[in-house]
């Protein structure tokens, strides 16, 4: 069972583990969607699915992580906002 802690002085509950997105990207550079390997995207989706299953609802990414944001978009879109 995932443990959660209050985030700073807010009422938000954050999991003690987060899913860091630095290595989710296909490349460090911006790429066309068609360049992302299907197997790599399936692996990313399975990773996020399992993380959410385990109660990890903090998934971070950054503009500097290449194609990470583009690849996470379709995966995160399938979850309700209150799940992540």
Locate predicted features.
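N-terminal binding-site loop/beta-alpha segment at the start of enzyme catalytic domains
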Residues: 1-84
């Amino acid at each position: 069972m995932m443990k959660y802690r209050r985030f700073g002085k807010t009422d938000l509950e954050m999991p003690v583990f987060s899913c860091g997105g630095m290595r989710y990207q296909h490349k460090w550079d911006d790429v066309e969607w068609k360049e992302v390997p299907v197997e790599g995207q399936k692996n990313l989706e399975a990773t996020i699915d399992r993380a959410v299953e385990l109660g990890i609802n903090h998934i971070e990414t950054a503009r500097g992580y290449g194609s990470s944001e583009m690849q996470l978009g379709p995966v995160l879109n399938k979850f309700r906002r209150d799940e992540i």
